[in-house]
């Protein structure tokens, strides 16, 4: 990165020196140089809001060309734009202006190349995940999974990157699902010091729904972690894995003791979320044949999936709202 700054803080602007000079600005300016192509997610967000209203909770971006993400280190990713919720393991912050939003936007999801996803959104293709499960995890990162337990320094529930559930965490508890899109697994206690993962990545668990503001704390069943397990907490969800260790029971009160209660509570929290599905093409190119139809199929199925995965407690809208 090459730039110049007047000192003492102030605004910062990225430029394309070849195309945008001369320019008059009041703060620092710079241009970023790289040895390989990348995606400017904030530029995508700003471009979107130049034509559409600031009336979206999530922007969900798909690329119509091959592109590695984060140097090949991610299949898809999410980054938070704004958080005002307390008691979910996240700081309070607002970076909306950088994304072109002055109010509602909370999350940016980068799904990567559309071509790497199966045409059938319910086909399992990435470990135990379908396209809908991947989308469930990435949009779910707006709230999940960052909870500590017992006290604010205990990450026993957490696995990969401290933002997914621990493989050894029975993330569904006694709930109706087979694990959580946020990882962890549905674990059977064999009663002899061994445990077996019996299901995984199946929508949102009761604990997830509590964190999302869709379920009161009183409706979250007890859960447990297999303490001392030989399985890496960051391991990808899998079915049929045997673990050995001690059962450590967890209640929602143990989590609230560490994080405090969720504010706003489920009684006052948002239940309907608007998400924009965005297809990005290379400059000057039309979408690939079939891409728009494929993405629209995903969009339509996602609205159904989200409602099902939240046990009918949450709703997604995907309509476009012009400025």
Enumerate the language-model features and the residues they cover.
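A broad "ordered helical/assembly scaffold" signature
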Residues: 1-4, 12, 108, 207-210, ...
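Zn2+-dependent metallopeptidase catalytic core
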Residues: 1-135, 139, 235-323
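Surface-exposed patches in mature extracellular/periplasmic domains of secreted proteins
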Residues: 56-63, 146, 222-228
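General "foldedness" signal
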Residues: 74, 212, 225-228, 289-291
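The catalytic-center signature of Zn2+-dependent metalloproteases
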Residues: 128-214, 221
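Substrate-binding/catalytic groove segments of enzymes
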Residues: 150-151, 219-223, 285-288
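Short linear, low-complexity motifs centered on an aromatic residue
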Residues: 203, 215-247
């Amino acid at each position: 990165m090459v730039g110049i700054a007047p000192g003492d803080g102030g605004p910062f602007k990225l430029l394309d020196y070849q195309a945008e000079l001369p320019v008059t600005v009041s703060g620092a300016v710079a241009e970023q140089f790289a040895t390989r192509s990348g995606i400017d997610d904030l530029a995508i967000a700003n471009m979107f809001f130049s034509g559409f209203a600031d009336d979206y909770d999530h922007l969900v971006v798909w690329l119509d060309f091959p592109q590695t993400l984060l140097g090949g280190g991610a299949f898809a990713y999410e980054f938070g734009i704004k958080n005002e919720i307390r008691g979910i393991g996240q700081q309070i912050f607002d970076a909306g202006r950088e994304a072109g939003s002055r109010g509602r936007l909370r999350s940016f999801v980068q799904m990567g190349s559309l071509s790497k996803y199966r045409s059938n959104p319910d086909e399992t293709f990435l470990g135990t995940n379908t396209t809908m499960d991947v989308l469930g995890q990435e949009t779910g990162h707006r709230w999940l999974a960052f909870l500590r337990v017992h006290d604010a320094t205990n990450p026993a529930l957490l696995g990969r990157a401290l933002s997914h559930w621990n493989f050894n965490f029975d993330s569904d508890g006694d709930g109706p699902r087979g694990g959580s899109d946020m990882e962890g697994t549905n674990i059977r206690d064999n009663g002899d010091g061994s445990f077996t993962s019996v299901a995984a990545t199946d929508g949102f668990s009761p604990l997830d729904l509590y964190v999302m503001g869709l379920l009161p704390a009183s409706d979250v069943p007890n859960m447990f972690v297999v303490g001392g397990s030989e399985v890496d907490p960051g391991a990808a969800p899998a079915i049929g894995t045997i673990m050995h260790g001690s059962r450590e029971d967890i209640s929602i009160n143990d989590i609230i003791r560490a994080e405090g209660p969720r504010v706003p509570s489920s009684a006052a929290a948002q239940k309907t979320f608007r998400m924009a599905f965005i297809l990005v093409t290379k400059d000057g190119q039309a979408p690939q044949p079939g891409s728009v139809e494929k993405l629209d199929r995903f969009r339509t199925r996602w609205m159904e999936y989200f409602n099902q995965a939240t046990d009918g407690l949450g709703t997604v809208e995907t309509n476009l709202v012009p400025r």
